[in-house]
């Protein structure tokens, strides 16, 4: 960041991937400016945000912010019933009270996908979130990204945020791998910072795993580590966890470990 003159920039915002606390804190420390995080989809305008100039709405780093006035949102369980604050559900938008501004009306030549997205008077985003007592919404993960292991539901973003606090981790993606005993086990695919790339990978695995054990619950700790040069991403920069899952699908766990 020291290479760039940011003194004339007044405000900064981000979207696409949830921002971890470390990035927010470093940015604030070096620029003196907050990052205003928001959330939307290709199918919509801004759905939630840490909106600027709202005196009663301070930035909560890592949150998607509060709902935009343009959308009436609900957080629903699998039976399309609202969940209480603090409980995880799918972020949905009311469409039973008139079609909201900036929201798609359907997917081109895909009746099935349109029917799936618009169901029960709601547009279903496919994103799992929870709302805190101040009305801020927090991203948990795409519905198909959530890892189910030994009866626990694990948010990839939560584990990624822990791992990225380790100085060796530049970025990472956490996914579930099929396991006969647990249903799924947690896997971390990691890009190391340049200073650590030549270190022994087994030693790095032990070091990062130890760090994870010290900072999160045992059931969330990755059991498999893969070190890569880069993560698969979309054109807009979002991590394609689905690509990692597809690569590992149907493989024996020991075979996956040997591959790395």
Each model region followed by its residue ranges:
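Gly/Ser/Thr-rich phosphate-binding loop
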Residues: 1-58, 72, 82
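Glycine-centered tight turns that cap/initiate beta-strands
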Residues: 8, 32, 70, 168-171, ...
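Active-site glycine-centered loops adjacent to acidic/histidine catalytic or metal-binding residues
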Residues: 16, 40, 65, 127, ...
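Adenylate-forming AMP-binding core of the ANL superfamily, especially NRPS adenylation
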Residues: 18, 50-51, 57-109, 116-117
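Beta-strand->loop->alpha-helix junctions that form or flank phosphate-binding loops
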Residues: 36-43, 63-67, 175-178
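AMP-binding/adenylate-forming catalytic core of the ANL superfamily
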Residues: 73, 79, 95, 99-100, ...
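Phosphopantetheine-dependent thiolation modules in NRPS/PKS and related acyl-activating systems
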Residues: 190, 238-260
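AMP-binding/adenylate-forming catalytic domain of the ANL superfamily
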Residues: 214-238, 255-260
